[in-house]
């Protein structure tokens, strides 16, 4: 993995201190594969998540699991009239604490499966770095595992918040373009540590085998670490770019957008060596950012979701438009560190298309550096959702 030492340190980062009991960290891997029999291309993901891991280090605690808190003596007191039934709390709400593995596919027929374990059942080696849990593992070059969830598992454990299915993967990856820092705030750190990554190997979902090829994988890896997410949650990224100016595929190009942080977004762009980085925590005079997320009609009866982003400073202007068919978006939910059955609910798609323009400011004029078509963009929009207790 030919990345900077700073990015390597970020890739290996695991929870320490207060974050172990009140926080989370995540490794997210996204890539494309081609089905061996039909040639159909699909977008896949694998995620490793640590949520409040030290709260209950010996067994996973899921916040949505039903836990009756009424004791026999409480019922006797109700019958005796010493306390009222209204004062009884019928369900105990626990703070979530676990290691979670997720894998799935985006687009038509999207689904995800998941597995949960505890910190004590997780093995983390520092040199060489390797993270292993639930029969799944990853290092700085290898990503492998298997997750199986049956329909009966979901009936018994609706708190899993996933689908049934069997997914296994055996992959190698090579990070081609890394950004060690994307956003650093008081409660959250985000890094597109593998903004452009080549994956190779196989990904099998419910018996369908997909080949993951380096030149067609359009891989992406990022890291989240902290105590809380910021909302709304917005993400766009793609390394599948084609120059509208020259018609050539841009082999060494990528862009990533992440936010929203105090009404600002972070943006990293590299178009064939022309690199621009905007970090949301920087002073408001350093750059301005504008974004919008909306629904718009397509062909009269279908809808698309539309992301627009414009960022500029004294030297550069970046304009991005991305569209994703609404029917191909997948709703995903995940628990938040604060517990109380609060979740982040995201619309996620892997078939975004659009355009990106990069301009350089020369006095009062704009010089167009690149104008490119965007394909297979990862598109996400999320909000916080609070359950009624």
Spell out what each predicted region is.
Residues 1-389:
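Structured soluble/peripheral alpha/beta segments that form catalytic or ligand/cofactor-binding pockets
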């Amino acid at each position: 993995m030919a990345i900077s030492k700073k990015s390597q340190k970020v890739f290996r980062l695991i929870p320490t201190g207060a974050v172990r009991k009140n926080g989370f960290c995540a490794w997210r891997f996204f890539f494309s594969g081609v089905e061996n029999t039909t040639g159909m291309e699909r977008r896949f993901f694998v995620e490793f998540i640590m949520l409040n891991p030290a709260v209950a280090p010996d067994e996973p605690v899921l916040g949505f699991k039903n836990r009756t808190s009424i004791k026999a003596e409480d019922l006797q007191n109700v019958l005796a009239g010493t306390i009222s039934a209204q004062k009884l709390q019928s369900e105990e709400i626990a703070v979530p604490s676990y290691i979670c593995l997720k894998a799935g596919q985006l687009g038509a027929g999207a689904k995800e499966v998941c597995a949960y374990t505890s910190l004590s059942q997780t093995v983390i080696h520092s040199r060489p770095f390797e993270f292993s849990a639930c029969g799944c593992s990853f290092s700085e070059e290898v990503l492998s595992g298997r997750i199986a969830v049956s329909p009966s598992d979901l009936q018994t454990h609706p708190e899993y918040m996933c689908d049934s299915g069997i997914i296994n993967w055996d992959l190698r990856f090579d990070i081609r373009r890394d950004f060690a820092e994307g956003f650093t705030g008081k409660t959250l750190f985000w890094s597109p540590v593998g903004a452009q990554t080549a994956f190779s190997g196989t990904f099998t979902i419910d018996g369908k085998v997909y080949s993951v090829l380096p030149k067609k994988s359009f891989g992406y890896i990022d890291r989240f670490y902290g105590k809380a997410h910021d909302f709304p949650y917005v993400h766009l990224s793609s390394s599948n770019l084609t120059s509208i100016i020259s018609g050539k595929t841009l082999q060494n190009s990528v862009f990533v957008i992440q936010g929203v942080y105090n009404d600002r977004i972070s943006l990293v762009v590299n178009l064939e060596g022309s690199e621009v980085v905007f970090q949301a925590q920087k002073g408001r005079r350093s750059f301005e950012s504008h974004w919008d997320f909306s629904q718009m009609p397509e062909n009269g009866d279908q809808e698309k979701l539309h992301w627009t982003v414009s960022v500029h400073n004294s030297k550069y202007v970046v304009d991005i438009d991305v569209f994703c068919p609404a029917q191909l978006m997948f709703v995903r939910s995940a628990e938040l560190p604060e517990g109380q059955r609060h979740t982040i609910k995201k619309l996620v798609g892997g078939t975004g298309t659009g355009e990106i323009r990069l301009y350089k400011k020369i006095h009062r004029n704009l010089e167009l550096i690149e104008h490119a078509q965007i394909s297979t963009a990862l598109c996400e929009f999320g909000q916080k959702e609070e359950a009624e207790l």
